[in-house]
Amino acid sequence: MTEKKYIVALDQGTTSSRAVVMDHDANIISVSQREFEQIYPKPGWVEHDPMEIWATQSSTLVEVLAKADISSDQIAAIGITNQRETTIVWEKETGKPIYNAIVWQCRRTAEICEHLKRDGMEEYIRNNTGLVIDPYFSGTKVKWILDHVEGSRERARRGELLFGTVDTWLIWKMTQGRVHVTDYTNASRTMLFNIHTLDWDDKMLEVLDIPREMLPEVRRSSEVYGQTNIGGKGGTRIPISGIAGDQQAALFGQLCVKEGMAKNTYGTGCFMLMNTGEKAVKSENGLLTTIACGPTGEVNYALEGAVFMAGASIQWLRDEMKLINDAYDSEYFATKVQNTNGVYVVPAFTGLGAPYWDPYARGAIFGLTRGVNANHIIRATLESIAYQTRDVLEAMQADSGIRLHALRVDGGAVANNFLMQFQSDILGTRVERPEVREVTALGAAYLAGLAVGFWQNLDELQEKAVIEREFRPGIETTERNYRYAGWKKAIKRAMAWEEHDE
């Protein structure tokens, strides 16, 4: 009798590294998770230690197999999904980073972005990379490291330094430096990649003065990139055969592989993607055009709206404001009041993402009166997540001409029934919550499994997708529009706050 086989998904996120073991029926067998340090050297700056990312991720891999009580030779393949845009530069010879990882949330490159705008690069970047000029993307982060670490640009030219997003870093470490590779989805988030020619963009490399020698090879999201040895007797070599940035992995895990299907992931930030099939839709409404995974991991395109603060705003209620002890408490307190008593919270702690793209916006609470209590502020913070999602959906529908009939949701905050119901109310559309919540890991597992024949095709996966609960709108259109108008007023007043500082 042959031993039962499994897929392992490594999910390297913004605040933790996770490993998930799945069987052929897409059941989760075991999960391991380790948090790591968030480093804030200056206001608006965010870093991670790349060695800590690697240490936490590699230890979760060992732990998850031990928890599942399976041996490494029962693993058919490993898929990787990761926080996108986060930028690492390391020495080819030693594998040692020359600087901390600069995280996607970090705003330190706002000045470089202003220069790009002044130099008239906006249209070129929009047309060729699908992105807007913002500190969010990797390109300006790589430039910043090369500008600030002495001698690094020359070393990069000589081929001594390598750049990678987190997927590239993990695969480099897992293959002992044999494989320097990324996939199309991660490359499409760097602002250095031409999403039409599917190659690094020479003009962007020239403008940011980034040597091509340091860039990884770009491949499909579902194929064998290399093999890793995860110990065990004789050290079984396991194929690494799936890579996708976290949001594209979630889109694939939700099986949004047809044009017009959309999902929203509620994690640290909020990320909404709509598959636009084989055509790259240029956004006129502040969204990104990005690469997604087609039915067999080939290139599809998607529209994306990124909201910077979702789950992070609930953490703020807990850690900084001390209004709740646990993120799960937010639903309980939000339902202790009938409404927000006119309060709007705009959680623009690190600026605003789509569709506004204002790095100078800052967080604010509007509509405070003497009758407002902590529960109103908690409720308004949760509601802000749903309002920001509507901002993105309005832009998406305008760009694509597609009216969304249902939104598939995933991520930690979808366990919050109050938030999901309010999301449906404020969108005026169905919200579908799947039974398997780990859809990001699921997407990475699907991509890895399809590449090695663990699953034969998408039809086999469709049978495994079960909707656990559907939320339907429960408020009238006039009420919906009235509340949303208040939100738009609040957003307007939070914008450009920092710009006026001398």
Swiss-Prot record:
Keywords for the protein's UniProt record, in alphabetical order: Allosteric enzyme, ATP-binding, Glycerol metabolism, Kinase, Metal-binding, Nucleotide-binding, Transferase, Zinc
Pfam families found in the cross-reference section: FGGY_C, FGGY_N
GO annotation terms (biological process): glycerol catabolic process; glycerol metabolic process; glycerol-3-phosphate metabolic process
Gene Ontology MF terms: ATP binding; glycerol kinase activity; metal ion binding
Residues annotated as binding sn-glycerol 3-phosphate: 14, 84-85, 136, 246
Chain residues that bind ATP: 14-16, 268, 311, 315, 412
CDD domains assigned to the protein according to its UniProt record, in alphabetical order: FGGY_EcGK_like
Highest taxon listed in the record's lineage: Bacteria
Keyword Transferase carried by entry: yes
Family label: Belongs to the FGGY kinase family.
Protein name: Glycerol kinase
